[in-house]
């Protein structure tokens, strides 16, 4: 078992020690490159880890959910299902709208996915209804991703139809053109149109039908090519008054003649300028508004996108009338910037604390300046590499640099402490620097590569979690590598020029007092260590008990996925009885808005009622609650949510579901709560049987809260049961019946008005204000084969039935999603386990499959790979240490320190009430790399003492422990203080940073206390084992 012999001539550091100018200029180059890189790096909340996601929306006004599913969604799904690289396809078919969300594999470029989607839509065109008003429209956006910015446009003098027209033509188009913007949606549904409201009684009295009116309007308003005349000397383009532009022109349209007298449209209908869809509405606070939600493209830089929007807004608002007001209600980048600023402050605090601890130990200003230069240089230099790797300044990379503060200073401390020891013995500074740097060079290399080895498994983590922590791991590894370079170049060079016997011996009262304190501590440690070495088996039992305890703690600690962040925005869903109308829902929404706006933490509120790409039915409403900045409110988001739900519970007939927006969005659909669980079947009937049973059981579990389902099968349906024989005798087809119903109740888009700026629709419907409710069906008239008018009631009966309000698919099969939250006193792991146990008690049939979705599915995947991740880190470190030490045994001695770190981290998390989530797990993996440093420093010097001074293993390890006690304590405290700002974090995004700090501080404290005693004992035990093994082999050889 040999190690590389330390060099007494400076080793790789010699060149840099002897050439101070070249070394200084090299470090200046690293510093300048880092500063330039820092200024060039984009800022974001988290690394870009979005799945390539595309949303396809098809609108078919008046179509029932069943028609939308069979006629629109299913043909599209069949084509989309043939695309390569598709990870998941979900769809939602509701009244008049089909929304299909396509999530592709992480490795597939978004542009490639877009091409495949466009080709699939083209292939499905001939399979879609011929009267579809518009073809399917796709957007490169994840509908579950909260908007980066929400704007409200209001006016005190103009109707909402004119406001929306201006917003759509002047504002939304310009914002959509900004790089990084994926989709601009206008909520409020006030797009201008000419609405024709037929008077059913008047039509019937004149012997007309709605189909007669529709045919007359479509024939009177056309916009087609007419040709041109090409004469001998000039060409003339043909044009005609074939377009009608205003409601007044339509009002004067002659639709028929009776007894020679014209019947104009205005005689049988109310014709007016109105909204294209009267069942849509949006509000900003209490004022009706057009709400613009701006969503980014997956992978786009959120900060630069938001900045571009804000820069454009003044120019856009200048083009609007003075009565129109544009208000930015929410901007996610505000909290992102605040979170990044807080993390940067914690990084500076970590640097300051580390420098302070260095001075406390070295008690010398020149000796403190040296690592004080090395630390920021290593961190700043990392920014240059981050630019080339297309990284960003985000919470995770800044957390990596904050943690790196404690790591990178270790190398400089070890070098300085070793060089100082020789200077204090009387060596000249230059000779001491050469000797000390050469002696410690191998230790620095061992520390560096064994620590980087721990990070290697993070690079191979799969799926979105792996992508998420790749930037973290690489950033930390780069900082550690640069630190090693600085410690072997700049640090010994500065020691040779700045340290001297006089400077090291110069002491003040503080220096003398601290020196005595450290001497007493080392003496006490020496006495304790001697006792421990005399009772090795007792110490070994303590080490083994920490291993057992760490396993037990791992089993019983609450487990989660990702910390719930307070980003100042709450997404809400308001649910009313399934038969609620738009008018009823809008009234309930305003009642809820009044209650929410009274909360002192709420700054603004936007709400939306109606069916569109995100809202599936008329009995639900979407809300976005924007909270005041964190420093202006007393409570964090979870307490605000609990308070709002309690207040809204007093509003009768509604259920409110709230969840805070998160920087990490894995879901592909807008959910009522944070977590989802799906049931998938081959038929809707199977879901209708088992969903209520499972819901009943889940709602009784204390580990779950806000349990709800998107299964809504009690929507009222007026089923028109046509007597086909009677209809056939009269020459009336089912197409005639459908057309008559569609004309009356479908807000049918029957014609288009073309202008230079935009296109507007003509909407046909019955005036239900004259004959409201189901009685309106009695006014429907059909034309028989002999030209007579036949009441619908003579050939059909109307039955009231129940049907789903929306039909959801997952990978082309019917699915229902059960949403839930987790109460504060339980963890996501508890909830997942209870759901799986409950599912087993139901004995679901084989044709029903269940699966967690979104972040819950990612949690299961991360939890399943965590143990293997830790094993991989340990194995990687063993291999590196084995290669460096040319030994199978010494790496085991070093790795024996790891259980103590796990025990400390898990205990700290449990005491602090934190879950074991992916952030905390990363902390534990980092601890694996930190705590083994103690053992490396002990074993390196013990092996050198055995080899060079001929000491016995016991004397060698005892001396090594006392000799390296101060640098071990110093490096551990430096790492601990580097993590301390994260643990004590209270600002924006603190929820994300705190678990990492808690785990590392707890692990470092426990491991520091235990490994100082267990490592030398285990070293001696393995040394004895090695001698026994050698003697056995020698005996066998002699016998042979």
UniProtKB/Swiss-Prot annotation:
Q: Name one GO molecular function term.
A: xenobiotic transmembrane transporter activity
Highest taxon, organism lineage = Bacteria
Keyword Plastid assigned: no
* Membrane topology of this protein: Multi-pass membrane protein
Q: Provide the Gene Ontology terms for cellular component.
A: plasma membrane
Quote the subcellular location field of this record.
Answer: Cell inner membrane
Q: What is its main location?
A: membrane
Instruction: Give the record's keywords alphabetically.
Output: Cell inner membrane, Cell membrane, Membrane, Transmembrane, Transmembrane helix, Transport
Say yes or no: keyword Transmembrane helix present. Answer: yes
- What parts of the sequence cross the membrane? 16-36, 347-367, 369-389, 396-416, 440-460, 472-492, 537-557, 863-883, 888-908, 911-931, 968-988, 998-1018
InterPro entries in UniProt = AcrB_DN_DC_subdom, Acrflvin-R, Multidrug-R_MdtB
Q: How does it assemble?
A: Part of a tripartite efflux system composed of MdtA, MdtB and MdtC. MdtB forms a heteromultimer with MdtC.
Q: State the similarity comment.
A: Belongs to the resistance-nodulation-cell division (RND) (TC 2.A.6) family. MdtB subfamily.
PANTHER family documented for this protein: MULTIDRUG RESISTANCE PROTEIN MDTB, PTHR32063
Stated name of the protein: Multidrug resistance protein MdtB
């Amino acid at each position: 078992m040999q190690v590389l012999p330390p060099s007494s001539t400076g080793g790789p550091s010699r060149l840099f020690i002897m050439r101070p100018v070249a070394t200084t200029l090299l470090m200046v180059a690293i510093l300048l490159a880092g500063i330039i890189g820092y200024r060039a790096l984009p800022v974001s909340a988290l690394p870009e880890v979005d799945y390539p996601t595309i949303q396809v929306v098809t609108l078919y006004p008046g179509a029932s959910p069943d028609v939308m599913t069979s006629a629109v969604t299913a043909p599209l799904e069949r084509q989309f299902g043939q695309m390569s690289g598709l990870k998941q396809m979900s769809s939602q078919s509701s009244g008049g709208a089909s929304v299909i969300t396509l999530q592709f594999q992480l490795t597939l470029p978004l542009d490639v996915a877009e091409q495949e989607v466009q080709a699939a839509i083209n292939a499905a065109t001939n399979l879609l209804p011929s009267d579809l008003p518009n073809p399917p429209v796709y957007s490169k956006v994840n509908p579950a991703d909260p908007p980066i910015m929400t704007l409200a446009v209001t006016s005190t003098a103009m109707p909402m139809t004119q406001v929306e027209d201006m917003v759509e033509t002047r504002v939304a188009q310009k914002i959509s053109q900004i790089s990084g913007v994926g989709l601009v949606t206008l909520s409020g549904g006030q797009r201008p149109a000419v609405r024709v409201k037929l008077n059913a009684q008047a039509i019937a009295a004149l012997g007309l039908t709605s189909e007669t009116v529709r045919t007359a309007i479509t024939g009177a308003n056309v916009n087609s090519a007419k040709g041109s005349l090409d004469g001998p000397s000039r060409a003339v383009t043909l044009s005609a008054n074939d377009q009608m532009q205003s409601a007044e022109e339509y009002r004067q349209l002659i639709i028929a003649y009776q007894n020679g007298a014209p019947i104009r449209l205005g005689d049988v209908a109310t014709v007016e300028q109105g909204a294209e869809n009267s069942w849509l509405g949006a509000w900003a606070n209490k004022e009706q508004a057009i709400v613009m939600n701006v969503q980014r493209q997956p992978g786009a830089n959120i900060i630069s996108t938001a900045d571009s929007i804000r820069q454009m807004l003044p120019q856009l608002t200048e083009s609007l009338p003075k009565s129109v007001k544009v208000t930015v209600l929410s901007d996610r980048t505000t909290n992102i910037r605040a979170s990044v600023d807080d993390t940067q402050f914690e990084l500076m605090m970590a640097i300051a604390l580390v420098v302070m601890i260095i001075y406390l130990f070295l008690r010398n200003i020149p000796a403190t300046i040296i690592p004080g230069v090395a630390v920021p240089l290593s961190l700043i230099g990392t920014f240059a590499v981050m630019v080339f790797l297309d990284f960003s300044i985000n919470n995770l990379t800044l957390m990596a640099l904050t943690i790196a503060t404690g790591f990178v200073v270790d190398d400089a401390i070890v070098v300085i402490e070793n060089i100082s020891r020789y200077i204090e013995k009387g060596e000249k500074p230059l000779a001491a620097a050469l000797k000390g740097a050469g002696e410690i060079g191998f230790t620095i290399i061992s520390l560096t590569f064994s620590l980087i080895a721990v990070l290697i498994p993070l690079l191979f983590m799969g799926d979105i979690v792996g992508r998420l922590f790749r930037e973290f791991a690489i950033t930390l590894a780069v900082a550690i590598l640069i630190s090693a370079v600085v410690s072997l170049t700049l640090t010994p060079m500065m020691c040779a020029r700045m340290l001297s016997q006089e400077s090291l011996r110069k002491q003040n009262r503080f220096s003398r007092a601290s020196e005595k304190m450290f001497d007493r501590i080392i003496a006490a440690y020496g006495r304790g260590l001697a006792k421990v070495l005399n009772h090795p088996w007792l110490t070994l039992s303590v080490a083994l008990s920490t291993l057992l305890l760490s396993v037990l703690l791992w089993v019983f600690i609450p487990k989660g996925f990702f910390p719930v962040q307070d980003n100042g925005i709450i997404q809400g869903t308001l649910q009313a009885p399934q038969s609620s109308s738009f008018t009823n829902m809008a009234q309930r929404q305003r009642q809820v808005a009044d209650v929410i706006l009274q909360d002192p933490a709420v700054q603004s509120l936007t709400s939306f009622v109606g069916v569109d790409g995100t809202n599936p039915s008329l009995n639900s409403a979407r809300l976005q609650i924007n909270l005041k900045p964190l420093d202006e409110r007393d409570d964090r988001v979870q307490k605000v949510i609990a308070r709002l739900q309690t207040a809204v519970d007093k509003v009768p007939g509604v259920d409110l579901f709230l969840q805070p927006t998160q920087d990490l969005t894995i879901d592909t659909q807008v959910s009522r709560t944070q977590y989802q669980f799906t049931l998938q079947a081959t038929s809707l009937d199977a879901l209708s049987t088992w969903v209520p049973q499972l819901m009943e059981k889940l709602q009784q579990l204390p580990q779950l809260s806000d349990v709800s389902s998107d299964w809504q099968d009690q929507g009222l349906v007026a089923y028109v049961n046509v007597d086909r024989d009677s209809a056939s005798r009269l020459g009336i087809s089912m197409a005639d019946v459908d057309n008559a119903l569609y004309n009356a109740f479908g807000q049918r888009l029957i014609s288009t008005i073309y202008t230079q700026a935009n296109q507007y629709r003509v909407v046909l419907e019955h005036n239900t204000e004259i004959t409201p409710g189901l009685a309106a069906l009695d006014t429907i008239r059909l034309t028989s084969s002999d030209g007579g008018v036949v009441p619908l009631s003579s050939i059909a009966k109307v039955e009231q039935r129940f049907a789903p309000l929306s039909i959801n698919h997952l990978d082309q099969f019917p699915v229902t999603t059960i949403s839930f939250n987790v109460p504060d006193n339980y963890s996501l792991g508890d909830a997942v386990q209870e759901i799986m146990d409950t599912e087993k008690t139901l004995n679901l049939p084989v044709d029903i499959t269940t699966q967690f979705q979104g972040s819950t599915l990612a949690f299961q995947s991360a939890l399943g790979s965590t143990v293997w991740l830790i094993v991989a880190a340990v194995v990687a470190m063993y291999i590196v240490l084995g290669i460096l030490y040319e030994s199978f045994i010494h790496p085991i001695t070093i790795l024996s320190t790891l259980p103590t770190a796990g025990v400390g981290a898990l205990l700290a998390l449990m005491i602090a009430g934190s879950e074991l989530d992916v952030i905390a797990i990363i902390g534990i993996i980092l601890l694996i790399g930190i705590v083994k440093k103690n053992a490396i420093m002990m074993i390196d010097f013990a092996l050198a003492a055995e080899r060079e001074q001929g000491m016995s293993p016991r004397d060698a390890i005892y001396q090594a422990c006392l000799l390296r006690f101060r640098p071990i304590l110093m490096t551990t405290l430096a790492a601990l203080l580097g993590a301390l700002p994260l643990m004590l974090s209270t600002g924006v995004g603190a929820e994300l940073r705190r678990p990492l700090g808690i785990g590392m501080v707890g692990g470092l404290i426990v491991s520091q206390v235990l490994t100082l005693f267990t490592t030398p004992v285990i070293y001696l035990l393995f040394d004895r084992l090695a001698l026994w093994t050698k003697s056995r082999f020698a005996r066998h050889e002699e016998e042979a």
